C-alpha cells in the first residue's frame, strides 16, 4: 500500500504512521528525516539540499521531490510506504505524479481546530529530561514540576496557542486543498480523530479495509 497521510498539525499523523508502518511492514517516509539522511549520506540531491540549508535558505520543491524520489527507490519501499508530511501543497503533489509516484490512498485524519489548540497548548515539557505531560490527559502531580525528575515544566514555543493557530492557518491555506486534489482522483479516505489513539487506529484500519 502506497499511502499519503493528511491532517492538521496535532492530528496524530506521526503516531498513526508508526502504528500503520508496523502493521503493514512498510516504512514511514518523513520529509525531515530523509532530508537529514540525504545530507548526511552526501547523495547528489542531499548535497544540493545542504547548500540551501547552510546558507539559511528554504530547500526548493524540486530538491525535496528529488530526495523523496531517491528514498522511494530504495528496496524497502517496493511493497509500499507511508508519506508523512509530503506532499504539503498541490504543486508538490503534481510534481510527485510527474515523477511517476502513484499513491493508492490519501488518508485524511479530521479534527477540529479547537481540539488541536486545546491539545497542543496543554502540553508541558520538562526543561531537564524533555518528558512531555499534558495538563488534562496526563496531568503532573506537583504544579509546574516534572513527575519523573522534578525539573521545571515549560510550554514549548511550538505549543503556544498563537503559534498553533498560525500553523493551522498555513495548513488550511496550503495543505488542506490536497483533500480535493486526491478526492478528484478517487483516492481520498477521511477518518475522524477519536478520543484515544487506539480508537483512531481502529477507525483507520476499518476505513482502509485492514481489520
Label every model-predicted segment.
Residues 1-211:
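Glycine-rich phosphate-binding loop of ATP-dependent small-molecule kinases
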Amino acid at each position: 500500500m502506497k499511502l499519503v497521510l493528511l491532517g492538521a498539525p496535532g492530528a496524530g499523523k506521526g503516531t498513526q504512521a508508526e502504528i500503520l508502518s508496523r502493521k503493514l511492514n512498510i516504512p514511514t517516509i518523513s520529509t525531515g528525516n530523509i532530508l537529514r539522511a540525504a545530507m548526511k549520506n552526501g547523495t547528489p540531491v542531499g548535497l544540493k539540499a545542504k547548500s540551501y540549508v547552510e546558507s539559511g535558505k528554504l530547500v526548493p520543491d524540486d530538491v525535496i521531490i528529488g530526495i523523496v524520489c531517491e528514498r522511494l527507490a530504495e528496496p524497502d519501499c517496493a511493497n509500499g510506504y507511508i508519506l508523512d508530511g509530503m506532499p504539503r501543497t498541490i504543486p508538490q503533489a503534481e510534481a510527485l505524479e510527474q515523477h511517476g509516484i502513484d499513491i493508492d490512498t490519501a488518508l485524511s485524519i479530521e479534527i477540529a481546530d479547537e481540539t488541536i489548540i486545546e491539545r497542543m497548548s496543554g502540553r508541558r515539557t520538562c526543561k531537564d529530561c524533555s518528558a512531555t505531560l499534558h495538563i488534562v490527559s496526563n496531568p503532573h502531580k506537583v504544579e509546574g514540576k516534572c513527575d519523573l525528575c522534578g525539573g521545571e515544566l515549560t510550554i514549548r514555543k511550538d505549543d503556544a496557542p498563537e503559534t498553533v493557530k498560525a500553523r493551522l492557518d498555513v495548513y488550511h491555506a496550503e495543505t488542506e486543498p490536497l483533500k480535493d486534489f486526491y478526492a478528484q482522483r478517487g483516492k481520498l479516505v477521511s477518518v475522524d480523530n477519536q478520543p484515544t489513539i487506539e480508537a483512531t487506529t481502529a477507525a483507520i484500519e476499518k476505513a482502509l479495509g485492514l481489520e
